Amino acid sequence: MEWLGETAYGDALALQQAAVADRLAGRTPDRLLLLEHPAVITLGRSSDPANLRVGEGGLRELGVELFEVARGGDVTYHAPGQLVGYPIVDLDGLGRRDVHAHLRSLEAGLIEALEELGVPACRVPGWTGVFVDRGRSARRDGPERKIASIGVGVRRWVTFHGFALNVRLDLEGFEAIVPCGLYDVEMTSVAVELAREEGPRALDARRLAKLDQRVREAVARSMQVQLTS
């Protein structure tokens, strides 16, 4: 696991391209890049323009960048307070040329980490990503609540792009898009769900200050298992 801190999205794209080239050439092992991005919206290969609710001019006024990228999925939003993970993994070397299995591994790793943190999490059939398990949550009403988005690219069976886990970012940023093209889904975060599960003490400044590190450590542990087994 490599923690890169806050990294501009364009710089992260270049870093991934170099990392994929190094992995293909056998110069480096599999890697997990963890970072945050300044406010940015990305459009995947399956994006519907209707799911971008604010035009490019409006996004510039808000200080939000816009990128079209070579990953699966629709539109998503990144900002500080969200943990982004880019696994650079040789699926062929693992003996599993199966992108769908890779997606399920990412989901499993995030679910395991969230459960360790005290957030009940699950998959929802038919959708990629990780959601709050409402049946085990303090709040059981309302729409499905999505806490992590996933979209990957693959070059000669080496993966790039990956996942975005909402830790404690300002969720209002998602109002500029229809996240992942899912109209009947509410975006949530680890901080919001912990406050529901544990009460106001979960938002104590000292606990929040440690939350980012706790999440990174939990994700790194779970992904180490999921991406190598």
Predicted regions and their residues:
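Generic serine detector
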Residues: 46-47, 105, 137, 149, ...
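C-terminal accessory segment of soluble enzyme catalytic cores
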Residues: 153, 164-229
